[in-house]
Amino acid sequence: MNHRKFEKWSPWILLVAVVALWQLICSAFNVSEFIFPSPWRIWTQFWEFKTIIAGHAWRTFWVTMAGFGIAIVVGVLLGFVIGSSRLAYAAVYPLMTAFNALPKAAFVPILVVWFGIGVGPAILTAFLISFFPIMVNIATGLATLEPELEDVLRVLGAKRWDVLVKVGLPRSMPYFYGSLKVAITLAFVGTTVSEMTAANEGIGYLLISAGSSMQMGLAFAGLVVVGAMAMLMYELFSAIENHTTGWAHRGSQNG
């Protein structure tokens, strides 16, 4: 197996090794399934409750995608405004940083009061926790446009808007796709956290229900499903990134 193939398969090799070690430790030390279930127990619970898990997983998925979609729109618009103006960058960026430092789980009770139990708090929590990386990366890509390049374009007759749209935004695409891969995982976290306290369905609700009934295998199966959905979306954005912004990674690919 050459280096490139090994690099491609390395995550799966590591995953299999971790699962095998996990199973070995649980079997060797007779770990209680009520404390730390083995991979085999998690699989049996997953298969037994696969229909129920699928229903909760679908709810978590589409709610996450709704919040994530809003985050993309708001993040790109805010990032464009902040990155295209020094005044906006100086005025808005510190406030957004302070807002991002607030624990998003603390917003869930407030959102429940405003919107009630259901999809509203989950969608908004997914949005609140995931828009910041998108905004920051778009703003960074625009704000770090080389002054020399901008001067040359101005000499050639380009206006400020032309520079931002035709040069700044394409240059920001690697930053944008990088932010999507981070933001989508955060969106799943936000949805799951909200569902644990403000929903009657979804993987977060399943985790609370399984934990309260001491079904640790089912709870871990729910966690695995969330991780799998996040990983699939991450790989999807990675594939799109490689096909659309391969020029930005040619140096690392050749190395």
Annotate each PLM feature.
Residues N2, A28-I72:
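Periplasmic/extracellular loop-to-transmembrane helix junction in inner-membrane transport proteins
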Residues I13, A17-L21, A54, W58, ...:
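Hydrophobic alpha-helical transmembrane segments of multipass integral membrane proteins
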Residues G55-V63, V113-I134, Y177, L218-L223:
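Loop-to-helix entry region at the N-terminal start of transmembrane alpha-helices
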Residues L77-V112, V136-A143, D151:
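Cytoplasmic-entry segments and transmembrane alpha-helices of multi-pass inner-membrane transporters
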Residues L124-L128, W161-V193, A221, V226, ...:
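Transmembrane alpha-helices
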Residues I134-N137, G141-V182, L207:
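Short cytoplasmic-facing helical segments at TM-TM junctions of multi-pass membrane proteins
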Residues G204-E241:
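Hydrophobic alpha-helical transmembrane segments of polytopic membrane proteins
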Residues E241-G255:
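Short cytosolic juxtamembrane segments of multi-pass membrane proteins
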